[in-house]
């Protein structure tokens, strides 16, 4: 019996590592091939002593498109982007399709009647808070399945804010 339990443990460990590596690969593909969309930030900036410096992100689009009682708790936010890649939600739907040529899909979830579109916090090095105070947009890379990754914060001129360190 011990022989089978060791084999079972090894097989499960290999599956776990395979799943982890696949997840990392998918995120790297989204960073490499995903479409950039900028979402305007609404003001929020609490600090956490336990976690270092961070900025809690509240997207203006999520605040202005408050869901009603009939909206599904999970689905897809359809965004239209302008020439500067700034996204605007045009509708919420529960399926990936239909999407027009000039539209982009981001997965959403609703918790306590609040719409979440992706990364809701941005961590930065201690002492860099003044650099990120000028952030106006959160930049997300989005794949064709609606998965999104926060790639950085952008200023009012649509430039990525980067630390000098």
Spans of model-derived segments:
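Alpha-helical transmembrane signal-anchor/signal-peptide segments
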Residues: 27-43
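Extracytoplasmic/periplasmic terminal helices and flexible tails
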Residues: 80, 86-92, 98-165
């Amino acid at each position: 019996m011990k022989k089978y339990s060791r084999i079972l443990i090894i097989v499960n460990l290999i599956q776990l590592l395979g799943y982890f590596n696949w997840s990392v690969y998918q995120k790297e593909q989204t960073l490499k091939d995903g479409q950039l969309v900028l979402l305007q930030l609404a003001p929020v900036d609490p600090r956490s002593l336990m976690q270092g410096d961070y900025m809690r992100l509240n997207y203006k689009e999520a605040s202005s498109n408050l869901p009603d009682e009939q909206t599904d708790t999970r689905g897809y936010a359809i965004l239209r982007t302008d020439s500067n890649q700034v996204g605007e939600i045009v509708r919420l739907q529960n399926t990936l399709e239909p999407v027009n040529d000039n539209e982009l899909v981001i997965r959403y979830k609703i918790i306590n009647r609040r719409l979440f579109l992706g990364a809701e916090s941005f961590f930065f090095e201690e002492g860099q808070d003044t650099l990120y105070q000028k952030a106006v947009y959160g930049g997300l890379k989005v794949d064709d399945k609606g998965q999104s990754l926060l790639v950085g914060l952008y200023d009012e001129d649509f430039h990525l804010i980067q630390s000098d360190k």
